[in-house]
A protein has these predicted regions:
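Alpha-helical membrane-anchoring segments
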Residues: 1-279
Length: 279
């Protein structure tokens, strides 16, 4: 979607510009509650980007390098809820917290594994609706590698009836079931020390996210699918020794993870107007 635009990324052009629109957490509060970005908003955003860049180019990612962003990202969320959501804090910030507070004994790997598993679970749950077959229909129709003769089968009766066909519905259900199966397979492999099952789970999420990525879906972050593959192989493929039960060594971290990954999304599914699914 972005090649027609130069540069092909533009978040900073909004968040680093005074006067642009924002959604403060405490509307009307002095200094932080305005509906347009001021120099405090810009300064904290730019500072966070520079701290992240320092961590990216550093020889080693340490808690000391991550700690400024550990503090700044929630602060930026208070200043602008939109910024907190577009930062994908429900995923990236949760893992950053694990890397900041649990790096000493590598418990952050177990925390990241828990995050990945819940992300797969809730992503699969979000597909259990009546409109997802239509999503599949358009995504596959736009995909450059999907056979042309199958593209027409995605529609009920092309070109007269452009609703999702049974074929598209079947693909949608298969996709949701595949995504839900990923954490089940990986956790079962960890519980049974089954290396073949672990590799099968890794191949499953590679195929799942890779399939989405190569179809160039509109309106969704392709880089997230790449990260799920890369992170999944690192966490589950190369670190089978890190178990979720290890998190009991840090009960406060475990409680915070369960609150963020289980409780908040559950509330959001029942009260979507109150709690964003991106939390």
């Amino acid at each position: 979607m972005n090649p027609p635009f130069d540069p092909s990324f533009g978040g900073y052009r909004h968040f680093a510009r005074p006067g642009t629109t924002k959604l403060p957490l405490f509307r009307g509060a002095p200094l932080i509650g305005g509906e347009t970005r001021n120099f405090l908003d810009v300064a904290l955003y730019v500072a966070n980007q520079l701290f992240l860049l320092r961590g990216l180019v550093g020889p080693e990612v340490t808690p000391a390098l991550l700690f400024p962003s550990f503090l700044l990202i929630p602060a930026l969320g208070v200043l602008d809820r939109t910024l907190f959501l577009v930062a994908r804090a429900e995923h990236y910030y949760v893992v950053l917290v694990c890397m900041t507070v649990a790096a000493a004994n590598d418990l952050w790997i177990a925390g990241a594994k828990l995050t990945w598993c819940f992300i797969w679970f809730w992503a699969a749950a979000s597909k259990l609706n009546s409109h997802f077959p239509s999503v599949i229909m358009f995504m596959m129709n736009n995909g450059p590698f999907f056979p042309h003769f199958l593209k027409k089968r995605l529609f009920a009766h092309f070109p007269d009836d452009l609703r999702a066909s049974r074929f598209a519905t079947l693909m949608a259900h298969f996709g949701a079931a595949s995504e839900a199966a990923i954490p089940v397979v990986l956790l079962t492999a960890a519980a049974t020390d089954n290396d073949l099952l672990r590799i099968a789970g890794c191949l499953l999420f590679t195929g799942f996210h890779g399939f989405i990525g190569i179809n160039n879906p509109n309106g969704m972050p392709v880089e997230w699918n790449i990260l799920m593959i890369y992170g999944g192989w690192f966490l589950f493929g190369f670190h089978p020794e890190a178990r979720l039960s290890d998190l009991t060594q840090m009960p406060l971290l475990l409680a915070a993870l369960l609150l963020s990954l289980a409780v908040v999304p559950t509330i959001g599914n029942f009260f979507p107007s109150k709690v964003s699914f991106l939390l």
